[in-house]
């Protein structure tokens, strides 16, 4: 029966297969399968036809760790640069699966606490087991005792004991032992500040109201119109307030200023160290001055009290008494290129060091000496280029302007602790292309900005204004020699530029100034006219080294030159009033501040010449060698504004202080019954008297 069923099933299957083949319309031969028959492939009409080489070509696939879904163009705002910046690096991490685990590290605090709790639970379970085992042992021991008691009770009649009471006491003892837990040993935690957070409901702090009584703030009604004059008045009031505050600051004593500064500053470790050093330096300065005062006591006594008694026997001759000699090792073999007294502190003077030799240019030095300490300068500044000139501001005596050999100008602030100039010109700000031979402070401009002038060999007279934190330049005039235009092949004309060497501004006429050149000419110029000169003087045959207006007489000026001459001029006349030949190149001249007829000149042969036109208008009343003739050459001279002394500098970096004898500073003699007249009017009349004599002689000739 089973074999027949299997056949029927197979027959039915083959019949069903034949029916399917007939239905599909495919002819299948006997003994073959469907999969072995060939099938026709169908291709789309736009399919690419590739060659065998293209089909066999291998393409390498590179797997990268970059996230394909990461953004490519993220832009964020940069507060530093103030613009939107493209973010180049983007985090490429992609999270595929994350699961929060419940494993705790053994070394962590939570792991230690859990381990400690497990040990506590295990210890309590062991103690319970020990207590139960002891209780069972006690019960087993009591059972035979009870049997023995019953036998004895049965044997001994009449001897009955209180057995139930004893049983109750034993049960109570067992219960107490079972109920008393075994206390494990306390283990100290490694961190006693461990705590577990527990949530609890607490009552929030209730709001409290506090009230107080006070006077209401005052109220005012204000109304005004904003117009031009109201704004101007407000600015004027503000300016007055600022000036008052400045005056208060100036009126404060230096000790109070120092205490306020020390209170305002927050001292760091470095600042405290620097303050300690400054305190030590101040103390060292005081000690140094005391030592020098004792060392140079005889010189100080001569400076104050000594007068040459031999002048009583010499009517028209005087002498120079050497006092102090100033020198510094760092400025050794650097020529003294400039001298200037401080207008406020009469014992302080500034010295500029550089070199006049074109082939031996080196560094420069700015030194400020005090007569109280001749051994070492009070201030010292160094520069990469040689300093050729300097000037100290009249109203701000801590500001020193200097001119360099490389054409730059700079301003030094003596109040600043650092050794660099506060302001300096650059090639972008219009610096000179040749050495700067002289600088002069002038009055502030309309906006109260500091202003000074400079002259250079490039032929430019430049006005420099300190606006905020930079130097702004304006070319006042360019020196052009007359009749010096040359034509070049292209048809253009070239003007020969004059080389300025010295200049000086008029004391009363603000716009007028004189300029000396290397060609020996002196030009009278104006700040208002930049295209032409007011007048031209054929002064010298060689370069003009100095030009100076007389401090008393407004028409008289003096010039000196390398042609050995010193000339005194009236600016209204083109010929000189006085000419003096000193038999050597004249480096510098200076008017005396106490007389309109006294001036000094220094020559390269090491001599200092002092003239007094009221005593002798033909020759010097003092002609004295100051330095060694063969070794040193005197370059500059300056009178002290108050004391009867002069300072001279040489080309070796030495500065010598000399005292004028009484004959070199004679005052008008007293006449019987008349008071001695003093003042500028007397000095002007004294010089006018001499000039009138010269004018009369010239008119006669």
UniProtKB/Swiss-Prot annotation:
Keyword NAD: no
Lineage: superkingdom: Eukaryota
Biological processes per GO annotation: determination of left/right symmetry; epithelial cilium movement involved in extracellular fluid movement; flagellated sperm motility; heart development; insulin receptor signaling pathway; outer dynein arm assembly
Any single Gene Ontology cellular-component annotation: glial cell projection
Annotated keywords: Cell projection, Cilium, Cytoplasm, Cytoskeleton, Dynein, Microtubule, Motor protein, Phosphoprotein, Repeat, WD repeat
One Pfam family here: WD40
WD repeat start-end pairs: 382-422, 431-474, 539-579, 581-621, 629-668
Function: Part of the dynein complex of respiratory cilia.
Record family assignment: Belongs to the dynein intermediate chain family.
Subunit and partners: Consists of at least two heavy chains and a number of intermediate and light chains. Interacts with BICD2. Interacts with CFAP45 and CFAP52. Interacts with CFAP53.
Record's protein name: Dynein axonemal intermediate chain 1
Species whose genome carries this gene: Mus musculus
Recorded name of the encoding gene: Dnai1
């Amino acid at each position: 029966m089973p074999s027949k069923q299997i056949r029927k099933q197979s027959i039915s299957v083959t019949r069903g297969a034949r029916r399917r083949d007939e239905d599909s319309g495919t002819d299948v031969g006997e003994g073959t399968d469907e999969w072995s028959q060939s099938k026709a492939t169908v291709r789309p009409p736009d399919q690419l036809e590739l060659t065998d080489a293209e089909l066999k070509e291998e393409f390498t696939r590179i797997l990268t760790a970059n996230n394909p879904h990461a953004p490519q163009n993220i832009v964020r705002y940069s507060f530093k640069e103030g613009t939107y910046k493209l973010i180049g690096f983007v985090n490429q991490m992609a999270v595929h699966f994350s699961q929060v685990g419940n494993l705790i590290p053994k070394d962590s605090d939570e792991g230690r606490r859990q381990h400690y709790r497990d040990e506590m639970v295990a210890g309590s379970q062991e103690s319970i087991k020990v207590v139960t085992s002891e209780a069972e042992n006690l019960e087993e021991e009591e059972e035979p005792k009870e049997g023995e008691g019953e036998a004895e009770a049965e044997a001994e009649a009449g001897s009955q004991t209180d057995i139930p009471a004893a049983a109750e006491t034993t049960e109570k003892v067992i219960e107490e032992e079972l109920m008393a837990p075994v206390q494990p040993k306390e283990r100290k935690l490694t961190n006693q500040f461990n705590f577990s957070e527990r949530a609890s409901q607490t009552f929030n702090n209730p709001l409290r109201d506090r009230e107080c009584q006070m006077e209401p703030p005052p109220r005012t009604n204000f109304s005004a119109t904003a117009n031009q004059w109201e704004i101007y008045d407000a600015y004027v009031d503000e300016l007055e307030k600022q000036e008052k505050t400045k005056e208060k600051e100036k009126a404060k004593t230096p000790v109070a200023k120092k205490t306020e500064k020390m209170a305002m500053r927050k001292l760091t470790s470095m600042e405290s160290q620097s303050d300690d050093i400054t305190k030590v330096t101040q103390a060292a300065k005081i000690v140094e001055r005391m030592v020098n005062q004792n060392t140079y006591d005889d010189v100080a006594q001569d400076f104050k009290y000594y007068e040459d008694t031999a002048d009583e026997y010499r009517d028209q001759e005087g002498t120079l008494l050497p006092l102090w000699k100033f020198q510094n090792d760092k400025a050794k073999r650097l020529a003294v290129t400039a001298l200037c007294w401080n207008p406020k502190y009469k014992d302080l003077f500034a010295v500029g060091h550089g070199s006049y030799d074109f082939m031996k240019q080196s560094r420069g030095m700015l030194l400020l000496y005090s007569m109280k300490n001749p051994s070492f300068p009070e201030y010292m500044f160094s520069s990469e280029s040689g300093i050729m000139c300097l000037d100290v501001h009249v109203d701000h005596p801590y500001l020193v302007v200097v001119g360099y050999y490389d054409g730059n100008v700079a301003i030094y602030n003596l109040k600043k602790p650092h050794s660099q100039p506060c302001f300096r010109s650059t090639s972008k700000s219009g610096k000179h292309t040749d050495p700067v031979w002289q600088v002069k402070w002038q009055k502030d401009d309309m906006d109260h900005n500091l202003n000074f002038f400079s002259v250079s060999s490039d032929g430019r007279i430049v006005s420099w204004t300190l606006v905020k934190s930079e130097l702004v330049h304006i070319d006042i005039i360019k020196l052009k020699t007359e009749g010096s235009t040359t034509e070049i092949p292209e048809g253009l004309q070239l003007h020969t530029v004059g080389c300025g060497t010295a200049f000086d501004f008029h004391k009363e006429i603000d716009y007028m100034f004189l300029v000396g050149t290397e060609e020996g000419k002196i030009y009278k110029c104006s700040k208002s006219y930049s295209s032409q000169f007011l007048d031209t003087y054929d002064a010298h045959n060689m370069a003009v080294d100095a030009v100076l207006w007389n401090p008393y007489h407004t028409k008289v000026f003096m010039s000196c030159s390398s042609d050995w001459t010193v000339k005194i001029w009236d600016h209204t006349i083109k010929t000189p009033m006085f000419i003096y030949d000193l038999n050597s190149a004249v480096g510098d001249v200076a008017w005396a501040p106490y007389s309109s007829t006294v001036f000094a000149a220094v020559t390269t042969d090491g001599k200092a010449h002092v003239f007094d036109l009221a005593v002798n208008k033909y020759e010097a009343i003092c002609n004295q060698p100051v330095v060694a003739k063969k070794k040193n050459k005197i370059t500059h001279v300056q009178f002290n504004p108050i004391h009867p002394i002069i300072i001279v500098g040489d080309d070796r970096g030495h500065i010598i202080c000399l005292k004028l004898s009484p004959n070199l500073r004679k005052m008008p003699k007293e006449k019987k019954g008349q008071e001695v007249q003093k003042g500028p009017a007397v000095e002007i009349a004294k010089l006018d008297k001499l000039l009138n004599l010269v004018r009369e002689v010239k008119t006669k000739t």
